[in-house]
Each structure stands twice: as structure tokens, then as C-alpha cells.
Amino acid sequence: MEPKLLIIRGTPGSGKSTIAKKIAVKFGVAHFENDQFLMHGDKYVWTPDDAKAAAKKCFDSVMQTLRSGKDCIVSNTFVTRKAVDKYANAAKKLGAKVMVMRMEHDYGNVHDVPAGTLASMKRAFQDYDGELIR
């Protein structure tokens, strides 16, 4: 049976992590996001270099899970179609079925992303064909 990848996208505070964690627990699947690789103990630390390394670790973790034949979820901002395609195309090459969900709620973000940055992300956000919008 083909593994499945659920890509959950949205701006900070849209509910990506919350829904991803709930789905992962309910179905017993792995969940990855860049943020989990930016934790230093209990502290979230974001720097450009750390963010780049975290993105690579997240991508590699997702692909390794799919290669092992297991379903998984990845939740990140994925603002552009290109960002979604990186995961979707690589997953499809591994024979995985890919689904994309976009979160559009505004719960407030836990990482204190500045309002100007959030506004820029929202303006730059691109639709993705076939995505489920929640």
C-alpha cells in the first residue's frame, strides 16, 4: 500500500500545528515541522542559519518516513507553490499519495512573529491546486 503525506500549510497562528498533532495522534502517524528542529531544550530559537538546517532536517525526516512505507504529516508555512511542490514532488517520486490542507484561522502565533512579517506572508501566500481550505 502506498504511503500518504498530508501537507498542512498556513501562516503562523493559523492552527497548522494544532490540527497536525490531533490528526497524527488519531491515526498514529509521524508529524514533522521545521519548528521542532528549532527547539533547544524547552526554548524555541530562530536564526536564519538554524532555520535553514531545521528545514533540511524536516524534509529529510519526512522523506525517510515515506521511504519506510509509513504515512506522515508535515506542517509548515509553505507560502509558495514552489515550497509545497518540493515536498509533494519528492513524495510522489517515492510512490506516496499527497494531500494538501491550508489553514486560514487566526489564533495568534506562539513565536511572536512581527505583525509586519505576518502581513507580508499573507499577501505573498499562493493558492495550491486541489488543496483543502479549512
Where do the PLM segments sit?
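Solvent-exposed, flexible loop/coil residues
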Residues: 41, 82-83, 129-132
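Phosphate-binding P-loop
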Residues: 1-3, 65-66
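Short His-Asn-centered micro-motif
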Residues: 8-11, 34, 74-77
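Glycine-rich phosphate-binding loop used to anchor ATP phosphates in small-molecule kinases
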Residues: 52-102
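Conserved substrate/cofactor phosphate-moiety recognition/catalytic segment
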Residues: 18-70, 104-111
